[in-house]
Amino acid sequence: MIDFLGGWKRTSYCGELRGGHIGQEVTLMGWVSKRRDHGGLIFVDLRDRDGISQIVFDPERCAEAHAKAESVRNEYVLAIKGTVAARPEGTVNPKMKTGEIEVLVTECKLLNPSKALPFTLDGFVDVNENIRLKYRYLDLRTGTLQQNLILRSKVAQLTRSYLSDNGFIELETPFLTKSTPEGARDFLVPSRINKGEFYALPQSPQLFKQILMVSGFDRYFQIVRCFRDEDLRADRQPEFTQIDCEMSFIDREDIITVMEGLMARIFTEAKGVKVELPIERMTYQEAIRRFGVDNPDLRFGLELVELSDIVKNSGFKVFADVVNGGGIVKGMNVKGAGAMSRKEIDDLTEFAKIYGAKGLAYVKMTAEGWQSPIAKFFTPEEIATMDKAFDAKEGDLLLFVADKPKVVNDSLGKLRNHLAAKMGLTDPNVFRFVWITDFPLLEWDEEAKRWAAVHHPFTAPMDEDLQYVESDPGRCRAKAYDLVLNGNEIGGGSIRIHQEEVQSLMFKMLGLSEENARSKFGFLLDALEYGTPPHGGIAFGLDRLMMLITGSDSIRDVIAFPKTQKGACLMSDAPSGVDALQLRELGIRLAAK
């Protein structure tokens, strides 16, 4: 028989009780995590979001409560009253926060039973993720996921407190906006009132936060949901959360200083990790030169070494021809990996090919010198020069790629991360931040045969590069900056264009006609003509940040109700079909599948 609360009030959470509570009368409420019948006495681990208390049903203390305990099973919901007591000698559990006490039950209410579970919640058995997502309400009862989400809440509170203390105003921007598909696809929402017209869910609040600066709010922030209809990965979701900020009358240094303080506050108070300020900085060009990528993981070495000048006149035509044809040759020294087998090197070669490399040359450093199929093509002087460049020692493994600069950097940059993971060089307890600055403003899109914005069309060029936007676009650097943590971009921002004529020029460079630019962004262009202050901002990906703080493998482990890699919610069965009446009201007719 199911009981009602009947006016009972919880006095403590299950994880709160300690030795200092011994002798107190308490009321606990929660779920049965485990039940053990010891021939008369029944022991139940009662769990809530705060932890577990062991409660004891003794028929001599309360026969009615003991009778109820005989019928309970895992995940039944109970409310109990009892007395906190010290555990008997020899039964103290130092692994539990409440391990020195137990609660002797005097009354019990069975608030709800539970069906047999589709999987256990103890974490000892691997469960298919789709099953976990289907029964997300059960999965969320597990300690790890609950603690992840509680910590996420703390980070959000710290963010609001810090930004408010620094003069930021929390403002909301619309979710139903105009579609301006320049990057990922928009999620579209049909308008019932204006048939044939659509809203778009925002990919970011970019334009609205800039307009708030035009409006004179000076400093804005928002912890906001954003939406992108794109193919998903372990660290991507169709809906995601940003810590979004914008500031007026500032330059890059002002933004970086304030946001470094935010990261230091979050990591100190939420993670117990001190962030050394100021955070290291590196230009985009330096990052590409040293690490092959613009989001380098600085927890380990494996830096890239360019060898083009050394090999351009060598007898190894593969390298020489690439360099003389406008390409480059780079390599890396994998310290202590000289014993790697040929199969392992072949596997690395196949990995590099994923990113465009045609092959991977290698050298094993032995007591006799180079052991490699390519050794015979180089003079002793060339070998000595490369050894010095690599700081090569006996037992090392040298890896080389020769190709166009983009292919070389992409393949070796990704290979560097792959090797670090394979060799255990990425300590999860180390957090290395770096600001990447001075990005290119524009990049040539070979497929579309036009220039594209590296960040977004509202990023301002460096003052000294503005003169080259039309004449030499590839030369222009952006007032953009990314914050990278352990090889993950966790935030990106820029100083914005605040002059209408410069913004119109940028749209022109991106291949937008004046009419098209006005159609998509006319409200921004109009606003820029009414006294817009210099302004800039940044957005941090809260989901990815929490994934790194908690050491999770996927952002799905730090989001309460995530989607699958097919964009589905298995629990609620979204997306789903809608009935014909709804479609008729919207003026929509579905094409045949």
Curated annotation (Swiss-Prot):
What keywords are assigned to this protein? Aminoacyl-tRNA synthetase, ATP-binding, Cytoplasm, Ligase, Nucleotide-binding, Protein biosynthesis
Sites where the protein binds ATP: R228, D229, E230, Q237, E489, G541, L542, D543, R544
> InterPro entries this protein is in?
Aa-tRNA-synt_II, aa-tRNA-synth_II, aa-tRNA-synth_II/BPL/LPL, Asp-tRNA-ligase_1, Asp-tRNA-ligase_1_N, Asp/Asn-tRNA-synth_IIb, AspRS_core, GAD-like_sf
Return the GO cellular component terms, semicolon-separated: cytoplasm
Give the EC number(s) listed in the UniProt record: 6.1.1.23
Q: Which PANTHER family match?
A: ASPARTATE--TRNA LIGASE, MITOCHONDRIAL, ASPARTYL/LYSYL-TRNA SYNTHETASE
Name the UniProt record assigns to this protein:
Aspartate--tRNA(Asp/Asn) ligase
